[in-house]
Amino acid sequence: MLFRSGTYYSELRKTHGHEVPYGVHVWCVGNEVDGPWNIGQKRAEEYGWDAAEAAKAMRRIDPKIELVAVGSSGTQLDTYLEWDRVVLERVYDSCDYISLHRYMGMPAIDELSTYDRRDTGDYLELASRLERNIQDVIAACDYVKGRKHSDKTMYISLDEYNAVDIGPEADDFLKECDPWEVGPCTRRTGISMRTTLLFGLGMLAILRHTDRIRIACQSILINGDGMVMCSPDEDAWVNGSWHIFRLCSLYGRGKVLETVQESDRYDTATCKDVAALDSVCIYHEDTKELDIFAVNKTEEDMEFTVQAAGFQQLQALEHLTVTAEHLSDRNSAKEKNKITTVSTQDITCGAEQIQCILKPYSWNVLRVKERIE
């Protein structure tokens, strides 16, 4: 696809009306080849060798491309992390990223025996498993970096992530259809506010590790557990995750500040001493804006105070809240805004301090700005 003409695929591209190559810059050297669900599954040693040789050939065609090696497909696999170590030993000098996939709440990955899906606190803690997954892969990368005495840093391509709403609240999993039907129906129940919160907590975990996560792709975009839902006989509508993703895209660009947080703690069905609050702060040097992402994981209002050291004069801009009346609420073609974003002006700013109230089970963005006199 990188040639203008003269190869089978470049000529095929031209027959479809595209004279110029698509200019794809990032290439994945395989996908989930460690997974037993795949035909052509490989051992780490086999894949590492093949990937390194493929990378060599691809860079001879275009030295400027970036390459993603296949990382372990899930923490549930016996080869988890050992796969990453072995592959990285082989491809460390020839690839730029290692992939990571995570679907929070998918039974095959987050084993039902290790958490209680009916317990909201337990369910929301699945975001901490994503964060641990990220930390594990970073550790594997840095271990190989040390082994090789390398100055190169391996980055992560989180090229599949989402929160999956499968369980008692989403019994209408798949509509019955002909197994050979082209474009069959997929689940269109949408995701609940509870799963929206889980997705939002996962986004904060990603933001905290953007020093190593250079690529992140939400999966899937349309239907299933996607951000956008549609049907041949109904209007399109958005899931709660769309609101989260939109606000992260708008206000999650900048410098992630190191934060220390204190909050009440609680126990869940299987977890002890869980923080009731999660938060991330982003500073935008160009606009002097400080955006605080905060999640109240409890059923009560939360008094939220930020000690913003070094920010002497602050001006409140907006408090954005993704919320719903009930955790089980979900958007649909008939009720498109049961989960929505609400804007209020309830932030109080003082010298190095920001205060507001976080609603129960809510995902928030507090937007403030340095006042320049």
Kindly label every feature range from the protein language model.
Residues 6-8, 35-37, 45, 72-82, ...:
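Acidic-and-aromatic substrate-binding clefts and catalytic sites of carbohydrate-active enzymes
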Residues 11-17, 57-79, 130-163, 214-221:
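Aromatic-lined carbohydrate-recognition surfaces of secreted/lumenal glycan-active proteins
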Residues 20-39, 71, 84-130, 154-155, ...:
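Aromatic- and acid-rich polysaccharide-binding/catalytic face
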Residues 27, 98, 137, 160, ...:
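Conserved, mostly hydrophobic/aromatic
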Residues 46-60, 82-86, 132-139, 198-205, ...:
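Alpha-helical scaffolding segments of alpha/beta enzyme cores, especially the outer helices
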Residues 151-279, 287:
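Aromatic/acidic polysaccharide-binding cleft in carbohydrate-active enzymes
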Residues 271-276, 295-373:
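C-terminal beta-sandwich/jelly-roll accessory domains of carbohydrate-active enzymes
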